[in-house]
Amino acid sequence: MTNGAITDLKKLTKLYDDAHLLSHVSRKVSSENELMAVMKKTGGKRPMIFHHVDDYAAPVVTGLGGTRDLLASSMGIRAGMLRQHLAHAITHPLAPHVVTQAPCQQRCITAPFSLDSYFPVLRHYEKDNGRFLISGMLTAKSDDGSKTYTSIRRMWYMGANKTTLLITSREMQQQLARHEQTHTPMEIALVFGLVPGVVLGSQISTHLYNADKLAVTGALLGKPLDVVPCKTVKLEVPADAQVVLEGKCFRGSNRRKVPLARWRTTTARLPSFRSANFPA
């Protein structure tokens, strides 16, 4: 379906729409269970765009990499090449390319603010104990700054600009423990609106392969990944991201007896959603 990797979510969404692979949900849906219930009818295997979620102006897209065929196509390869392509990217990484301006800097919002004033935070199951952010890519750096960690984390929304963060990575747990010993928070960024290839790059093991995940991601996409420096933390994030939350992670404030670290955002950076090239 593609002649090369797609790095921009809006372009990929339009490509799926042009190929009649995108399902449009035009009626208003609720962020309380309903959106996820509709998506689950397809098993997450069908690209979907929800045009009216509660009263938010921005649409919500799901399922862009829900099958091996979709994932491979977004990177310009065949599904049968996925393993070989990933192995080659791990062994032949491409260092990211730093840019000074990016779409995710079109609109900058500083605390105090509430995340759910700008985009929906979903309740996924009826019996969930709250609303969760689940599709954001966490970005952090090793203590010496030599490696970038990226991963998909589930975050329980606490209201305003606070959320919990579940960390299962051994290296990051150890890093958090060192920050706790020195009473210093760990700088992080949470990134939304990424193409499937970037998400795939976040899933390899940094510990096993001793790799910088953003460099592996560049190899997956066939060219160095454009990254832009954050405004309030010393990190770089994908320049084509739709939403970037910058913040700091605090250990030792678990909530509801769940082993989660506490995360407090300091700045939310959002693009101009109204100028996005989504199908009408």
Where are the model-predicted features located?
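Extended, highly charged
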Residues: 1-280
